[in-house]
Amino acid sequence: MDVQIIALDIDGTLTDDQKNISNLTLEALIEAEKKGIRLVLASTRPASGLFSIRDQLKMEQFGGILMSYNGGRITDCAGNTFYEISMGLTMTRRILRFLEELPVTVIVDDGKMFYVTDKNGYKVEYECRNNQMQCTEVGNLADWLTFSPIKILLAVDPMKIYEVQEQIRNFLPEDLTVVRTAAFYLEIFPRRINKGQGLCDICRILKIDVRNSIAFGDSENDIPMLKAAGIGIAMKNAEMDVKKASDMSTLSNNEDGIPYALRALNVI
C-alpha cells in the first residue's frame, strides 16, 4: 500500500489522557512526513484549537491539512480555506431555544471566541483551555447570535447524555445531526459534515486516491473517517462500535498506539 495520507483524530487518539503527544508518537509522525506522507488533523475543535499540535508536528513545513469542526472547515496550515459549511442562522436560533429546556451547557464559537451564557457552566473552562481560546459571556444565545456557526457544542452529564441525544435527534430537521464526541460532549452539525466526507474531499483536492490513506480514531464521530480510509485503525480505548467499523485495532492513546500501528504496517 502506497500510504500518502495519515488522518488523525486528536483527543483520545493522538493525545494521551493528559492531552499531550508523546515523544515516540511525535517522532514517528515526523518521520512519516519526511517520507512524503501528509498528515491531516481531524477534529471537532475549531482550527485554532489545532495550531499547537500543527506546530509540534511541523505540519506547515510538510504540507499538512487541518480538518476542523468534524469536517465543516478544511484549511491548509497557512490558514487558506478549501471550504466551509455552516448552519443556517434561523435554524440555529430555533435549536438554541429548544436547548434552553434541556440539561446542557451550550457553547458556540466563531473560530476566534467561545460564546456561552455562563462562564462557570459545565466544561466551559475545560473547553477554553483545551482549545486555547477565550470565552465571552452573553445573555440569551438565541437572541444574541448574529452569525451562522458551523456547529453547536453541548456539554452534558455523562449519565444523561444518551437520553439528551435522543431528545435532540427527535427535534432536529433531516439535514442536521447530533453525535457524541466524548463521554460528556454532544455536537450538532449539518448532516453532510463528517470526517469521512472531509477525508474524501481532502484526497480529491490533493489528487490522492483515498485508498492510499490511513485513519486513526476512537469515538463515534470517527467512524465515517475510519470507513472511508484505505485502512481505518481504532485505538484500544475506542468505543466498541468504533472497533467494529475499523479494519484493525492498535494500542491505546496512552500506549503509543499510532507508532505501533505504523510500524506494524511498515509505513515507517
Describe the role of every protein-language-model region.
Residues P46, N70, G111-K112, F184, ...:
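A generic "binding-loop/recognition-motif" signal
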Residues D2-Q18:
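Asp-based phosphoryl-transfer active-site loop
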Residues M1-I5, S22, E187-I268:
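Mg2+-dependent phosphoryl-transfer enzymes with acidic/Ser/Thr/Gly-rich catalytic loops
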Residues F98, L102-F216, N237:
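Conserved acidic, metal-coordinating active-site core of Asp-based
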Residues N23-K123:
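Active-site phosphate-binding/coordination module
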Residues G36-V40, F62-G64, K151, R211-N212, ...:
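Short active-site oxyanion
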Residues F62, N70, F171-E174, A228-A229, ...:
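Short, structured coil segments at secondary-structure junctions
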Residues T25, L50-R54, V164, I168, ...:
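Hydrophobic packing residues within well-ordered alpha-helices of enzyme cores
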